[in-house]
Amino acid sequence: MKIKSVVSVLVMMMLLMSCGPGQKKSADGNKNSESIKFETETQNKDNAVPGAVLSVAMVKDSPLVGIFNEAMYKDGYDGDVIEWFLTNVILDIDENFEITDTGIATLNVDPENKKATIKIKDGMKWSDGQPIVADDVIYPYEVIGNKDYTGVRYSDESAKIVGMEEYKAGKASTISGIKKVDDKTVEISFKEIGQGIFTGGNGLLTYAMPKHYLKDVPIKDLEKSEKVRTKLVVAGPYTISSIVPGESIELKANPNYFRGKPKTEKVTVQVVNSQTITAAMKSGKYDLVFDIPTELYKIYKDFDNIETLGRQELYYSYLGFKMGKYDKAKGENIVNPNAKMADLKLRQALAYGLDINQMVKAFYDGLREKATSSVPPVFGKYYPKDLAGFPYDPEKAKKLLDEAGYKDVNGDGYREDKNGKPFEIKIAAMSGGDIAEPLVQFYIQQWKEIGIKGVLATGRLIEFNSFYDKVEADDPEIDVYFAAWGVGTNLSPFETAGRKSMFNYTRFASEENDKLMAEVASPKTLTDPNYKPEAYKKWQEYFINQAVEVPLTYRYQLYPVNKRVKNFDVAYGSQKKGKGIHLVELTAAEPIKSKK
């Protein structure tokens, strides 16, 4: 859809849906329209043909960063390549995101003694044929805890392991709480242990790293090394045979994969621009399409060569407010009480001033819904369904701004700051796709209606990689930003809201936040099955009310699949049932073309 027509539709909807004074718009402002339902597994039952190549498109409007290691990657697109093809995960999860015994290793937890034991099964090998051993299980902890580590996986949770803080500070050469029992067994001691350990939290890492291959690379140089970029040793179903940096990857089947050598010998992964992907799908160029923007669904949904699979994504988009900076020396987030966005009523007003349900209907064709919590609904027992969030209420927004002292002094339609000086908010938003520009203009227009002037930081939309570089670096040109989180199956708040987490991009921290998050990981969660859901609800009630990270939307993750593909399954926990990319077969020599 063209930008002009998107804006026209949106303006028309605003006229049709707006409410007069005194009407209870906020009562309906949280009511979500029904979303579309999708199958999670291909229906193709035809016989496979030998020698066909699986062609995968990754929709991205900028080059692939290309760091393919769980401890080192930062970009979600790299994470997708790892998850599907190059994984080093050794602990499987089920449909409830809880660790099972179906993976490379098993987990046994001793709550009373605050210990966990990881045991590698017999016959497990890396792609180079070397056995997966206890040292490989220990090495990721040594990497992320090292003082020279350049990644972002170290968090408040990591410090729960006995001796990790001393190791991180350089006061110890080993992590005292991690013990190699034998070549296949590792015992980890924790200062405290909570229910999150069963979903890969509490400082537990669910992946290994091939120490025999990586140990000679200084940890400070690991992120730049070809051993995590182009020449990998992995535990997953495929390995890299060749790569064009940023553009494409050629993969070959790993004969040592523990579930069996993949049925399709060769895979190609190509980065494809969002402007050209639907035409390529129609012409039968790709078999699987990852990370396709949801707004393109209306274009390809009727292609007769495509079957669209989908699942509710572990994802929420959000509005973030910059509250301070990350102090690298202290390793924690420092709130600036004088930050432009420091006033709670200002932040809440901006949240109440956005009609997200209206935006979802105009832009996303039933593939998203308004979010009220940082917990997506797919986490059934943890999702706080009664949490109201910020239903659209422009009158309440205006009242909050008045109370906070932001008033229009000169009658130009925009409010000045508390001192009567011109006030504007610099907004960071990502480029990519047809709706990126009209979407941010929608936000700017909505804030204009409550008297707040919003302008684009840098004067334009920001390319994906540069956007996160600026947000992570606390660029002073950014006051607010629109971003999204892929939520880990651990469902731990520490990674994105913790005092010590680099991923806490808002830089918000408070003693109350620390206390409530600690309860989410309390040892009580091990004995009381209702404790964690209740603790999560209490934390969410506080955190959402602070309006530092305002959830905007949940979405479906869509996987357009060419109809020659067989045995592709996207359901969560499908590996517990023995399913996975290694079983995918192709029933035609080339991808099928659409006749429509």
Where do the language-model regions lie?
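N-terminal lobe/hinge region of extracytoplasmic solute-binding protein
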Residues: 54-111, 233
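Aromatic- and charge-enriched surface segment that lines or borders ligand/interaction sites
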Residues: 105-153, 280, 339-341
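Surface-exposed binding/hinge segments that line
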Residues: 154-216
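Detector for C-terminal structural segments
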Residues: 255, 351-383, 435, 439-444, ...
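Extracellular/periplasmic solute-recognition and catalytic clefts
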Residues: 58, 150-160, 241-255, 262, ...
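Gly/Pro-rich hinge or "lid" segments in bacterial periplasmic/extracellular proteins
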Residues: 202-261, 266, 276, 283, ...
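Append "and occasionally in soluble cytosolic enzymes with long acidic Gly/Pro-rich linkers
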Residues: 338-445, 592-595
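Ligand/substrate-recognition segments at binding pockets and active sites
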Residues: 245, 407-484, 557
